[in-house]
Amino acid sequence: MNDFDSEVISIFEETNALLKWHFILRSGMRSGHFFQCAQVCQHMDKVTRLATLILKTISFKDINTIVSPAMGGLVIGQEIARQLGARFIFLEKVNDRLALRRNFSLDSKDRVLLVEDVVTKGGRVREALDIISKYECELVGAVSMVDRSSEELNFGVPFEALLKMNFPTYEADKLPQDLLNLPATKPGS
């Protein structure tokens, strides 16, 4: 745990963003815990504080462009960009795949940091990094508010998270009894 973990957890709890139930995650895995970052993102004072904490804890420097995948990373990515005085662009879903649209582009002057809300298995981060790597920019690294993965993630670039929480995840056919007793829900992701 870092110096800010208890504050970050408190922010998630105060905003009802740390949920407990039987959830189907975007990865298809099941969990008894879910970070619904959209609940935090309703409160810009909390978003501002989380962005400030992220910038205090990350080691990435001289960033001039923030890229976030829609939807989860948009609000926190934009606030980090605002605090840095950096440009903010986003990737959005087209036919369930991420794409860089709206005449957004990256070039050799861009030092890019990818910002996401929550990482579990890293699929969305990998997809976003694949898109960014097609441009002649310098990809500095990736950061998330929450890393809930149970293993060390390797994205081919440095990855840091404000909060590391290892809640267990399960295959649908290997659920513990407490989750078997609850109907599964797929929260917005």
Where is each model-derived feature located?
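PRPP-associated nucleotide enzymes
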Residues: M1-S189
